[in-house]
From Swiss-Prot:
It comes from Agelenopsis aperta. Its main location: secreted. It is found in: Secreted. Expressed by the venom gland. One of its GO terms (cellular component) is host cell presynaptic membrane. Belongs to the neurotoxin 04 (omega-agtx) family. 03 (type II/III omega-agtx) subfamily. One of its GO terms (molecular function) is toxin activity. Omega-agatoxin are antagonist of voltage-gated calcium channels. They block insect neuromuscular transmission presynaptically. Potent blocker of N-type calcium channels (Cav2.2/CACNA1B). It comes from the Eukaryota. InterPro entries: Omega-agatoxin_II/III_CS, Toxin_34. Keywords: Calcium channel impairing toxin, Ion channel impairing toxin, Neurotoxin, Presynaptic neurotoxin, Secreted, Toxin, Voltage-gated calcium channel impairing toxin. This is Omega-agatoxin-Aa2a. Pfam families: Toxin_34 (PF08396).
Length: 28
């Protein structure tokens, strides 16, 4: 699933882990 908005991606940048992960490592 996608991490909540504003949540840390824990270093993962792949969309399979975080639907809208930006380059700063946070979901948007």
């Amino acid at each position: 699933g996608c991490i909540e908005i504003g949540g840390d991606c824990d270093g993962y940048q792949e969309k399979s882990y975080c639907q809208c992960c930006r380059n700063n490592g946070f979901c948007s």
